[in-house]
Regions:
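Glycine-rich beta->alpha junctions and the first turn(s) of the following alpha-helix
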Residues: 83-182, 264, 280
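Single conserved hydrophobic/aromatic residue that forms the stacking wall/gate
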Residues: 1-10, 14
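Glycine-rich phosphate/cofactor-binding loops in nucleotide/flavin-utilizing enzymes
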Residues: 119-135, 228-285
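A structural signal for short hydrophobic beta-strand segments in well-ordered beta-sheet cores
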Residues: 26-29
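C-terminal helix-coil-helix/basic helical segment that borders enzyme active sites and/or dimer interfaces
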Residues: 158, 180-244
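Hydrophobic, small-residue-rich alpha-helical packing segments that form membrane-like cores
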Residues: 18-20, 35
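A generic structural signal for well-ordered coil/turn residues at beta-strand boundaries
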Residues: 22-24, 49-51, 65-68, 77, ...
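A short core secondary-structure module
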Residues: 38-84
């Protein structure tokens, strides 16, 4: 089963702290040969399948909030851990939910599960997030856009094609230009990494543009399928429910994809935060 990593989609959000990660309250008390962890983290992706989980925890109270945070690897089978599913608007089937809240109550974590040095978790998390945010987007976005083009060339029940709608195709063309520009940026960053440099603030740029383009593509997909996206009644298989989907697989999943991808501009640091990072580190504001 997968090891769940703090640098993945929704692991950076702690209960009641939202995107203000430095204010996290999940604590790890030093008990000699182990830490005693209490607190919660939320929007944890696939926690129900994980054997291990990486957590940022507060090991000391400091004047500067970013200090006193440490990086722990915690066994998900430990006593005191409870995983509660979060039902989301994309209406995934029972037992197939994506995100969870993980609660820690007096969870014992061996000292050897500390990653790096105590109190330097913030530094490690920022480094990992650079690579998560700078993840390559263009290849997948190209595929999604090509799928839209293909579907747009199919006649609807009235004999019309969206590929003949100038407004729809203009929206497609604008997104393709943006993806081309992003691919060029990704290739430049790969060159920098090969030269031994870090990703830097460009990762915030890629995360912002990549997720917003992805959201725009899901919006066009819903527009393309029209009323086939409305029923939104058959998200997947459930025990005892075998009603066939209405419309094609693409049409049947357009609305769930649209709702699910609303999260993309929030996870790994909201896009508003990414713009603040770019303003500070790139523009010096």
């Amino acid at each position: 089963r997968p090891t769940h990593n703090v640098s993945s989609a929704a692991s950076d959000v702690y209960k009641r702290q939202g995107s203000d990660l430095a204010s996290l309250k999940t604590k790890a008390e030093d008990k000699g040969d182990h830490y005693l962890v209490n607190g919660a983290k939320t929007w944890t992706t696939m926690a129900q399948h994980a054997d291990m989980i990486f957590c940022l925890v507060r090991t000391s109270q400091e004047d500067i909030r970013q200090k006193g945070i440490s990086f722990l690897l915690i066994d998900m089978h430990s006593d005191g851990i409870e995983v509660q599913p979060i039902n989301t608007l994309d209406n995934t089937p029972i037992g197939h939910h994506e995100v969870n809240t993980v609660f820690f109550e007096d969870v014992k974590v061996p000292k050897e599960n500390l990653i790096g040095e105590e109190g330097k978790g913030w530094t490690y998390a920022k480094y990992l997030l650079e690579f998560e945010r700078g993840n390559g987007y263009s290849s997948e976005l190209y595929q999604q856009l090509q799928q839209l083009k293909t579907k747009a060339s199919i006649e609807d029940i009235g004999g019309n094609k969206l590929s003949e709608d100038p407004n729809f195709m203009e929206a497609i063309a604008k997104l393709e230009v943006q993806i081309n520009a992003m691919e060029a940026t990704e290739l430049r960053i790969l060159g920098s990494l090969a030269a031994g440099q870090n990703v830097g603030p460009e990762s915030s740029l890629l995360k912002t543009r990549g997720t917003e383009i992805g959201q725009a593509i899901t919006e066009l997909a819903v527009e393309l399928v029209g009323y086939y996206g409305i029923p939104f009644h058959n998200p997947g298989p459930e025990i005892g429910i075998n009603e066939p989907a209405r419309g094609s697989k693409f049409a049947n999943t357009a609305a769930p994809r649209y709702f699910n991808y609303r999260k993309a501009s929030i996870y790994a640091g909201s896009n508003e935060i990414q713009r603040n990072i770019m303003a500070k580190l790139v523009l010096g504001l």
